From Swiss-Prot:
Domain PX span(s) in chain numbering: 1-109
Source species of the chain: Homo sapiens (Human)
Family: Belongs to the sorting nexin family.
Subunit structure: Interacts with CCDC22, CCDC93, VPS26C and VPS35L, associates with the retriever and CCC complexes.
Protein name (Swiss-Prot/TrEMBL): Sorting nexin-31
Amino acid sequence: MKMHFCIPVSQQRSDALGGRYVLYSVHLDGFLFCRVRYSQLHGWNEQLRRVFGNCLPPFPPKYYLAMTTAMADERRDQLEQYLQNVTMDPNVLRSDVFVEFLKLAQLNTFDIATKKAYLDIFLPNEQSIRIEIITSDTAERVLEVVSHKIGLCRELLGYFGLFLIRFGKEGKLSVVKKLADFELPYVSLGSSEVENCKVGLRKWYMAPSLDSVLMDCRVAVDLLYMQAIQDIEKGWAKPTQAQRQKLEAFQKEDSQTKFLELAREVRHYGYLQLDPCTCDYPESGSGAVLSVGNNEISCCITLPDSQTQDIVFQMSRVKCWQVTFLGTLLDTDGPQRTLNQNLELRFQYSEDSCWQWFVIYTKQAFLLSSCLKKMISEKMVKLAAENTEMQIEVPEQSKSKKYHIQQSQQKDYSSFLSRKSKIKIAKDDCVFGNIKEEDL
């Protein structure tokens, strides 16, 4: 599936010799990721083509005449589509050519030198461990260092992830974003405009049943236990009074296995809860709290009469979704030059044999989209595993089903839409028609 890359703004810049060029601000999951020139992206594409050949998506062509504003805007759209499409191939995502270019782009954008540094990683019990890293270490590498330090089985790394987490008042926490494997945690944390933001370790799967895969690793069980306690304390998981009493008894006994077995029966166990937001049901501006997990989106909606209503959307009935940028551009001469995070996520849902759109307005729209994609991918893995079992029992019948599953894995359920008619362009955000290709 596509990653959440977008280029909402391009800027005209002058080099030391007075020449002009265009700088594209690339955002990932709604946050500034790097700034690059067309020539840099073009060179990167050429490197990728030498490795992967013609399986890459088309790259925007060079212009040898002066570009009009419309042409420049079209190029920006094409570069955005290229970044989204090229990341659909997992082989490209894991390649050295892909990762090394983006590492350098992040470091150069935020003027960070490659050197040794220390990074605090917060565990689910909100205690931290300090690790020594290189500022150019990717999230994948940092996760390996963390796992080695705490003794987590290497083969279980894929079930955990690094997140930017905001710690608020009165013990509240908010998951800001999941760090992509190729992101540099040191850079992403340092460039974040979110107050009290830390890098945290959390499990990264949406199906509570996957806990069973981790139960033979003591450290993994410790992490699950910590996160389960934290989720219950924060109100993300909602045990009944009877369940709470039993859980407290198991906690006093330090019986982690029994605690987790019961926790899996708790409502919203293993779900990720978003910050309070608004939605368009039953009317626009209705308050909502969303919990995502176990193949569903659970919404607690505040009605106009202050009563609450719980609505559950099953992922099996979600056809597609898209994230739309509704905000305005901030001052492009500021230190961060990011976006005013006004986002919506809308998904198409089947209700009584009729497809309807449900709209959620939240700054965590990209995180929500990542959770939906994760649930889809987990479902595909499960179907593939079941298909393998069927293949052993009924080889001929399973062939067609396997092909269908493989095709489904390539389906793109999500999209990013930049609603440009609603974007207020800052003074220097436009690319003027007298900029030529050699200036880029």
